[in-house]
């Protein structure tokens, strides 16, 4: 998606050969026009897949997921990372490790919102080693729902996430595929 790549080139900051900072438009400050375009693109790619729910993880996956949900006309569920007084019974949970934050957390979704009748599109801001995606897949599998695929805003293709997910049989659609962050420069695949 050229609009996204242009934004990464102009506003992304390479912090190391493994970390890309995009807080100017995606995971701190949000560019709503770009998010709308991202939602449209995910909807275009998954429109014919019978999606009934979109599942993401808080917090940075919420904006692109909501825009895709708006375009597809389906609800969005975000897995919570933090305990809540209102979210405590009948939970589907998984443990995930955050590459960026270097911390493990338990994510949770209420069984009220996800069932075996659902066909799910997973959306997330980044795909690196695939830990968050695998956690969401675990939760969706616990519910007995089916997975149409994964929509990723930015994929770090030099890490193993995509390969592992595809080898497990999942469809991965990434809007920007980063081949390298070497020498402080973003290099894209395609």
UniProtKB/Swiss-Prot annotation:
Record-linked InterPro entries: PRibTrfase_dom (IPR000836), PRTase-like (IPR029057), Pur/Pyrimidine_PRTase (IPR050118), Xanthine_PRibTrfase (IPR010079)
Catalyzed reactions: XMP + diphosphate = xanthine + 5-phospho-alpha-D-ribose 1-diphosphate
GO process terms (BP): purine ribonucleoside salvage; xanthine metabolic process; XMP salvage
Keyword list, A-Z: Cytoplasm, Glycosyltransferase, Purine salvage, Transferase
Binding residues annotated for xanthine, in chain numbering: 20, 27, 156
Location in or out of the cell: Cytoplasm
EC number: 2.4.2.22
Keyword Transport: no
Binding-site residues for 5-phospho-alpha-D-ribose 1-diphosphate, renumbered to this chain: 128-132
GO molecular function: xanthine phosphoribosyltransferase activity
CC per GO annotation: cytoplasm
Enzyme superclass (EC): transferase
Pathway the protein contributes to: Purine metabolism; XMP biosynthesis via salvage pathway; XMP from xanthine: step 1/1
Physiological role: Converts the preformed base xanthine, a product of nucleic acid breakdown, to xanthosine 5'-monophosphate (XMP), so it can be reused for RNA or DNA synthesis.
Family that this chain belongs to: Belongs to the purine/pyrimidine phosphoribosyltransferase family. Xpt subfamily.
HAMAP family according to UniProt: XPRTase (MF_01184)
Record's subunit section: Homodimer.
UniProt-recorded name of the protein: Xanthine phosphoribosyltransferase
Gene that specifies this protein: xpt
């Amino acid at each position: 998606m050229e609009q996204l790549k242009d934004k990464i080139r102009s506003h992304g900051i390479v912090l190391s050969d493994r970390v890309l900072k995009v807080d100017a438009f995606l995971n701190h400050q949000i560019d709503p026009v770009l998010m709308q375009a991202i939602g449209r693109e995910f909807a275009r790619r998954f429109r014919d897949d019978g999606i009934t729910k979109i599942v993401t993880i808080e917090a940075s996956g919420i904006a692109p997921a909501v825009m895709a949900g708006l375009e597809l006309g389906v609800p969005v569920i975000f897995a919570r990372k933090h305990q809540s007084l209102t979210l405590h019974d009948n939970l589907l949970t998984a443990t995930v490790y955050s590459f960026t934050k270097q911390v493990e957390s338990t994510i949770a979704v209420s069984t009220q919102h996800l069932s075996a009748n659902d066909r799910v599109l997973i959306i997330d801001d980044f795909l690196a080693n695939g830990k968050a995606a695998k956690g969401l897949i675990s939760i969706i599998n616990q519910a007995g729902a089916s997975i149409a695929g994964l929509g990723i805003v930015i994929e770090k293709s030099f890490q193993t996430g995509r390969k592992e997910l595809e080898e497990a049989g999942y469809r991965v659609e990434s809007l920007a595929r980063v081949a390298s962050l070497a020498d402080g420069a973003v290099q894209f695949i395609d």
